[in-house]
A protein has these predicted regions:
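Active-site HxH/HxHxD metal-binding segment of metal-dependent hydrolases
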Residues: 32-117
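Conserved beta-strand hairpin/beta-sheet module of binuclear metal-dependent hydrolase folds
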Residues: 1-43, 137-147
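Short secondary-structure boundary segments
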Residues: 29, 54-55, 78-79, 140, ...
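Conserved N-terminal entry element of GNAT/NAT acetyltransferase domains
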Residues: 1-3, 118-122
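Aromatic/hydrophobic pocket-lining residues that form the small-molecule binding cavity
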Residues: 29, 60, 168, 172
Length: 202
């Protein structure tokens, strides 16, 4: 399995494309649906699903257009689903002065320990509240999509609607107890759980 990164949108959000043979899975299609679709067409990849780590506007701006073009199912954390249509929760007006909502109805609302099969992997859902009420991470055999919970030498904001410093601290502690994996965050460069354990003195 290969993982490619596109940095998209006004907040430079990482959109990840997982590829196995001729199939693809998207994580957080932030913006620029045309660019994402161009990539899929160039590679002749069939899109099998779209995963959201949370429902802030900068992680889901291309969802509707991509679903319309491909019919791919949307997987959304159930506790964060209200943010798909609520601009107060998805922060679109707060950051851009424009409201944004996702009209696509999720095919699957994800809960703790659910798995998403793809290729030779089963991505496991780990609830990681703190940045938002319903943030999740997706754990693979040797990688972790951490959304805005864990960054390279940092972590997501909690001074926003739905944020909780206490919950984020608990989520970070949980992630840092996992076996070492490459971490693909919502913003910035990849890291590893081993490096972050050292950085946080865990």
């Amino acid at each position: 399995m290969n993982i490619e990164t596109l940095v998209l949108g006004p907040l430079q959000t990482n959109c990840y494309i997982l590829n196995f043979e001729k199939e693809a899975l998207l994580v957080d299609p932030a913006a620029d649906a045309e660019l994402i679709m161009k990539k899929l067409h160039e590679k002749e990849w069939s899109l099998k699903g779209i995963l959201l780590t949370h429902t802030h506007f900068d992680h889901m701006g291309a969802v509707d257009a991509i679903v319309k073009a491909t019919g791919a199912p949307l997987y959304c954390p159930y506790k964060d689903a209200p943010g798909l249509r609520d601009w107060g929760k998805n922060l679109s007006l707060h950051f851009t002065r424009h409201t944004m909502q996702v009209d696509t109805v999720p095919a699957v609302l994800l809960h703790e320990w659910d798995t998403v099969p793809f290729g030779n992997e089963r991505l496991r859902v780990l609830e990681a509240p703190g940045h938002t009420v319903g943030s999740v991470c997706y754990e693979g055999e040797d990688f972790l999509f951490s959304g805005d919970t864990l960054f390279y030498h940092g972590y997501g904001r909690t001074d926003i609607p739905g944020g909780s410093e206490e919950q984020l601290s608990q989520s970070l502690s949980r992630l840092l107890t996992l076996e070492n994996r490459t971490v693909y965050p919502g913003h910035g460069q990849p890291t590893s759980l081993e490096d972050e354990r050292i950085f946080f003195g865990f």
